[in-house]
Each structure stands twice: as structure tokens, then as C-alpha cells.
């Protein structure tokens, strides 16, 4: 039985602006002395942050593509990072289990490291801006099988959530306040961190069906949660209340009446699409990849999903139903990461084969451009929120900026 049936995609961009595909490298930024593992643009796109094997976090200015700050203090590889949705701070966590908070304007560390996890950190998630416009709380997951809730203003751990029987590999903090965690124990758990049961938090439900560990989670609202109140061409909100209102409006528009959708990807070569707020029964099981699924991402408008696999392919699926739409072939090594343009019209993929490929949703079967230049595997990848550039980070210790 073949799952490679090709279906015509009726693509209609919902974005108010059009992103042109990136076609060339305009800058190779050096400074890291080991592999660049993590790469992320700030919500307003004005800064880029990178982290990796050299234990340093670096901030880069995206208008001049020059280094701004080098932040040292980590005592092991920087494994995961995230921006606050208002861009005020950047959080990084390492293999020793320490979490550090940085002021991107000055490059200085804010407060003391957050310690308490017994093993390395696997993921960090901020509480959404429309739930807390002051961006005070983060959740972290670890190889120690726990989730911790921290107040980054006070530096205190507010809660430790237990229940998984294996390392927690991925984490999301959803727009309704629920936390989703995927684990080596083959389950996804849905938590209410402010639950009113006897314990401070409560397990809402457990989602089962995968035959192997969960590698990746994605929400259909990831993009709007990440960018908060920032909208290209609109002035920045003047107050936290205004920011909260705009962030809520953006969230509501993307999830619509259908609600939040969660996608899980696994070592078992499959994905499941869920309505995690209301049901433990999956909407759909997504079959077709021939190897483990490494990364998944909803398009910013929530209508599509891209998945990257060790089978060297990127696949496109319907974000509402989970229906298979297209296979993007061309990479000759495992696909480590995928990223969407802000208008949901293009995808970039980074691979073990040392290339970045650009794909168009109008005709996704063949890569629009192949961007060579890295001397080794491409681990980190992000498309700037304003759509003007893509950043890639590699085992070759460089960060490359690609432009149209």
C-alpha cells in the first residue's frame, strides 16, 4: 500500500504581506568554536541568538549581520533556547541542567542560574503573552523525567510536575494555559499547571498510541505564541494590556472555532494529530515517513504542517485533518529542521547533507533553490518574522544568513 499519492494543493496565502524566497548567502558569521545547535530570531526579528557546543550564547544584529554580545557562563553544551514572546529576555539551558536568563540589549545575565533539574534540559517554553503580558513564567523539561515551572523574575521554582516514566523530550505551553509534554515513555501528557486539585498542578489526560519515544511536538498556534504582539507594519503596543489584547486577538484568529491542535512526531515513523484540550482520541494518524521524525512545524496560519525525517524527506500535511499532501524530495541526508516563512508560502529545510533547501507551496515537489555553503551538517534553522532572511547554524561552527 502506498502513501505517496500526490494531491494538488489549493494554496491561498492569508498573510497581509508576501515573502520572497531566499536565494543567496549574504553573510557568514563566525565566532562559535563548536557546532551551532540552536538558532532563533527575536519576536520582532531585530536580533538573532545562537547557542551550541562551545557553551556560549551569541547575539547578532540582523540589520547589519554583526555580532552584538557573547554570553558566557554555561558549563556544558547549550541544548535549548527560547525568546520571551515580548523579546525582553532570552533563556538558554545546558547539558548540566542549568538555565540562564540573558538581557539581549546588554548581553548580561539576569539573576542567578536556575538550578534544580538533576539531568540535562530538553526544552523550554514561555507562558503565552496573552495569559501573562509580563512574561514571568517558563516551563522546562528534562532528562530527569520532570517539568519545572519557574518565575524568572524571582528566580524561584514554583512547581515540579512528575508523572512521566521516561525522559521528557519536548514541551509546549498552549494558548489555553495547558502544558503538553512528549516523552521517551511513548506518551504525551496534558497538564494544567494552575490546576485546582490537591496537588498544585494536575494531569488532565494522557495521549497514547505511539510505539516509540516522542521526538517532537508542534501546535497550530506556535507562530503567534512565539511572536506575541508583534505584527509587521504595526506599531509596538504601548502597554502590557495592549500587548495582551493583540496577542489574544492573533491567537484566537489562528485557532478559530476548531481550537488548538497538537501534532506529535515519533521514532516509530508516525505522527498523530490531536485536539488535546478536549479529547484523548487522535484526529488522525499520519503515515508515510520511512524513518524517525525529527522535527515538525505548523505553518504560521495553522493550515499546513511540514515534517522532517531521517528518511531524507520533508512531507506536507493538512493542518486541520492530517491528510497527506506532498513529499519534498532532494536532500541526500537526514532532515534535521524545517522552518516556514511568515506568510506560510515557503519552507526551508536543513540537513545532514550540509545544504539548506527552499521550497514553494505553489509547487512543493521540487526544491525552488538549493543553498550550499556550509561545510558540515545543518542543525539550526530559522526564518525571520519579517520574512527578509533565513539563518542557518552548522556543525561547521558558522551561522549563515540567506537573503532574497
Labelled PLM ranges:
Residues 50-54, 92-96, 140-144, 181-185, ...:
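Conserved strand-to-loop turn within each blade of WD40 beta-propeller repeats
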Residues 29-36, 72-78, 96, 114-121, ...:
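WD40/WD-repeat beta-propeller blade N-cap
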Residues 46-49, 67-69, 87-91, 100, ...:
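Structural hallmark of WD40 beta-propellers
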Residues 57-60, 99-103, 124, 147-150, ...:
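WD40-repeat beta-propellers
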Residues 39-45, 82-87, 125-135, 165, ...:
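Loop/turn segments within WD40 beta-propeller blades
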Residues 56, 98, 118, 146, ...:
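A conserved positional marker within WD40/Gbeta-like beta-propeller blades
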Amino acid at each position: 500500500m502506498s502513501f505517496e499519492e500526490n494531491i494538488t494543493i489549493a494554496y491561498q496565502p492569508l498573510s497581509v504581506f508576501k515573502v520572497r524566497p531566499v536565494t543567496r548567502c549574504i553573510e557568514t558569521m563566525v565566532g562559535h568554536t563548536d557546532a551551532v545547535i540552536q538558532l532563533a530570531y527575536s519576536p520582532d526579528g531585530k536580533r538573532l541568538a545562537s547557542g551550541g557546543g562551545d557553551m556560549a550564547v551569541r547575539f547578532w544584529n540582523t540589520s547589519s549581520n554583526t555580532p552584538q554580545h557573547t554570553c558566557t557562563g554555561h558549563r556544558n553544551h547549550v541544548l535549548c533556547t527560547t525568546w520571551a514572546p515580548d523579546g525582553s529576555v532570552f533563556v538558554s539551558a545546558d547539558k548540566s541542567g542549568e538555565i540562564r536568563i540573558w538581557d539581549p540589549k546588554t548581553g548580561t545575565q539576569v539573576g542567578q542560574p536556575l538550578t534544580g533539574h538533576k539531568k540535562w534540559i530538553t526544552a523550554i517554553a514561555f507562558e503565552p503573552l496573552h495569559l501573562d503580558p509580563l512574561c514571568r513564567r517558563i516551563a522546562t523539561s528534562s532528562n530527569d523525567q520532570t517539568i519545572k515551572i519557574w518565575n524568572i523574575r524571582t528566580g524561584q521554582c514554583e512547581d515540579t510536575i512528575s508523572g512521566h516514566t521516561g525522559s521528557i523530550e519536548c514541551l509546549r505551553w498552549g494558548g489555553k494555559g495547558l502544558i503538553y509534554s512528549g516523552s521517551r515513555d511513548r506518551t504525551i501528557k496534558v497538564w494544567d499547571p494552575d490546576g485546582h486539585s490537591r496537588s498544585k498542578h494536575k494531569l488532565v489526560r494522557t495521549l497514547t498510541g505511539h510505539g516509540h519515544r516522542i521526538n517532537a511536538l508542534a501546535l497550530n498556534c506556535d507562530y503567534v505564541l512565539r511572536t506575541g504582539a508583534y505584527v509587521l507594519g504595526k506599531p509596538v503596543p504601548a502597554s502590557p494590556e495592549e500587548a495582551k489584547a493583540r496577542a489574544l486577538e492573533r491567537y484566537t484568529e489562528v485557532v478559530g472555532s476548531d481550537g488548538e491542535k497538537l501534532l506529535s512526531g515519533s521514532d516509530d515513523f508516525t505522527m498523530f494529530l490531536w485536539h488535546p484540550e478536549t479529547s484523548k482520541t487522535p484526529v488522525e494518524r499520519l503515515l508515510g515517513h520511512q524513518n524517525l521524525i525529527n522535527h515538525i512545524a505548523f505553518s504560521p496560519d495553522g493550515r499546513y504542517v511540514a515534517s522532517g525525517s531521517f528518511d531524507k524527506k520533508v512531507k506536507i500535511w493538512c493542518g486541520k485533518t492530517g491528510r497527506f499532501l506532498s513529499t519534498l524530495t532532494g536532500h541526500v541526508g537526514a532532515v534535521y529542521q524545517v522552518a516556514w516563512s511568515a506568510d506560510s508560502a515557503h519552507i526551508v529545510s536543513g540537513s545532514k547533507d550540509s545544504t539548506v533547501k527552499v521550497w514553494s507551496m505553489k509547487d512543493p515537489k521540487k526544491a525552488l533553490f538549493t543553498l550550499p555553503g556550509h561545510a558540515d551538517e545543518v542543525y539550526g534553522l530559522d526564518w525571520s518574522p519579517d520574512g527578509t532572511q533565513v539563518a542557518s547554524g552548522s556543525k561547521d561552527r558558522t551561522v549563515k544568513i540567506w537573503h532574497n
